[in-house]
Amino acid sequence: MNEEQRKSTSIDILAERDKKTKDYSKYFEHVYQPPSLKEARKRGKEEVNYNDDFQIDEKYRNMGQGKTFLIKTYGCQMNAHDTEVMAGILGALGYTPTEDINHADVILINTCAIRENAENKVFSEIGNLKHLKKEKPETVIGVCGCMSQEESVVNKILKSYQNVDMIFGTHNIHRLPEILEEAYLSKAMVVEVWSKEGDVIENLPKVREGNIKAWVNIMYGCDKFCTYCIVPFTRGKERSRRPEDIIDEVRDLARQGYKEITLLGQNVNAYGKDIDGLAYGLGDLLEDISKIDIPRVRFTTSHPWDFTDRMIEVIANGGNIVPHVHLPVQSGNNAVLKIMGRKYTRESYLDLVNRIKTHIPNVALTTDIIVGYPNETDEQFEETLTLYDEVEFEHAYTYIYSQRDGTPAAKMNDNVPLDVKKDRLQQLNKKVACYSERAMQQYEGQTVQVLCEGVSKKDDTVLSGYTSKNKLVNFKAPKSMIGKIVNVYIDEAKQFSLNGTFISVNDKTVVTQ
């Protein structure tokens, strides 16, 4: 779908701003369709175009002159990357960043819809801004990100949070200048939410957070439709960037001196599958990027279904592709996996793990797990625990199932009592802590290479950073070491971190092309 087609199907509250009625929520309910699994599955047939000509119109260039902005970001790395893009656009409009919310002229809340707790935090944040809006009515408050793509969320804001000036979604960040202008001119709340994704927009300005590590989007959206997940609806179908655009961005980051990049996508393993006539996947992209002078390259998030032997081969070759694989399993029971729509079985997952470990003996495996899924029995949960023992994950992100409106799982009977869910989470977390501590202990007495990222959050006399396998290391050293890869001798292994002694700067170079 190209930009013109996209605009013709967008939700246009802007055109209604001059109407006398103020019942925008009713209007929105009529034109906005809630997530439809049936319709969403058809979307792969629509064409995706690439826009290389993004420019900010000159008439917007001084819009933010003398004004400040603040963006509060919730959620995943993709949201963090979107925040960098929005900061880049606002900077190009003349706005300057501030960390003081009371002095910000524009406040954007970049939201996450993955769990109910994240949404509750956002609504609390919006509510807290009501007092600020009364004191400074000229402040523009905007809500964006994944929550903005949900009908129920937008209607709630329209009805209960009149301090919000504008709402926009994940598909039209590049239209921020136009949306901002409308917010300044309109007396009503501005809502521009695209229910379908648009073109892949290149050349968007970015203000990256720091100059050590960088996010690099390689694709957008997800077509897996796990039954618990809202992301395929809030982020749209899978759209891969062209390899040459990604490689050019990585080369530019190398020239700027970045030490680590993370290739981003809701399902990075599916990279390239949506581009007709391109026999080029994530393994090929990793191999090409391995020839660029970036010391470390990571990728996230992986779906086991699309994890290929080609990827394993490239990671096994070493170089700058780190030996850390985050491979969400979600459950160890086949019946639960089937209800989740995960497309693999316990056996196929373990077979993949075995292939990874065979070819990459030094790999660090981590995962995501959900407990208390609808109809999950004690016996089924026990299979998750035994799978954890079999794989020996070095860490896991664990969650109690959170119902998301609009997903197939939301229609299921959530019949696992909350106290049972909490007990299962506690059991699982004990196992996570046990295996994490075991993984950490093998580093005692060893020298590791640490990318020093800054001072410790707990002690500003201590520096901290991560190993290639994503282990947190704390050590004392001159602050001039920040941004460098250094050698650290590990004196003490803790449950989730390592303490060490600084030895030297690691001046090992990466082979370049």
From Swiss-Prot:
Residue intervals of the Radical SAM core domain: 208-438
All residue ranges annotated as the TRAM domain in the record: 441-504
Compartment list: Cytoplasm
Enzymatic class: transferase
Binding-site residues, [4Fe-4S] cluster 1: 76, 112, 146
Binding site for [4Fe-4S] cluster 2: 222, 226, 229
GO CC terms in record: cytosol
SUPFAM superfamilies for the chain: Radical SAM enzymes
Ranges for domain MTTase N-terminal: 67-185
Keyword Plastid: no
SMART domains: Elp3
Cofactor: [4Fe-4S] cluster
Cofactor note: Binds 2 [4Fe-4S] clusters. One cluster is coordinated with 3 cysteines and an exchangeable S-adenosyl-L-methionine.
PROSITE patterns: MTTASE_N, MTTASE_RADICAL, RADICAL_SAM, TRAM
UniProt xrefs under CDD domains: Radical_SAM (cd01335)
Chloroplast recorded as keyword: no
EC number(s) from the headed UniProt entry: 2.8.4.3
Reaction catalyzed: N(6)-dimethylallyladenosine(37) in tRNA + (sulfur carrier)-SH + AH2 + 2 S-adenosyl-L-methionine = 2-methylsulfanyl-N(6)-dimethylallyladenosine(37) in tRNA + (sulfur carrier)-H + 5'-deoxyadenosine + L-methionine + A + S-adenosyl-L-homocysteine + 2 H(+)
Residue stretches in coiled coil: none
GO MF entry, a single one: 4 iron, 4 sulfur cluster binding
Keyword annotations of the record: 4Fe-4S, Cytoplasm, Iron, Iron-sulfur, Metal-binding, S-adenosyl-L-methionine, Transferase, tRNA processing
Job of this protein: Catalyzes the methylthiolation of N6-(dimethylallyl)adenosine (i(6)A), leading to the formation of 2-methylthio-N6-(dimethylallyl)adenosine (ms(2)i(6)A) at position 37 in tRNAs that read codons beginning with uridine.
Cross-referenced NCBIfam families: miaB-methiolase (TIGR01574), MiaB/RimO family radical SAM methylthiotransferase (TIGR00089)
Family listed: Belongs to the methylthiotransferase family. MiaB subfamily.
Quaternary structure, from the entry: Monomer.
Protein name (record): tRNA-2-methylthio-N(6)-dimethylallyladenosine synthase
Organism name: Staphylococcus saprophyticus subsp. saprophyticus (strain ATCC 15305 / DSM 20229 / NCIMB 8711 / NCTC 7292 / S-41)
Organism lineage: Bacteria, Bacillati, Bacillota, Bacilli, Bacillales
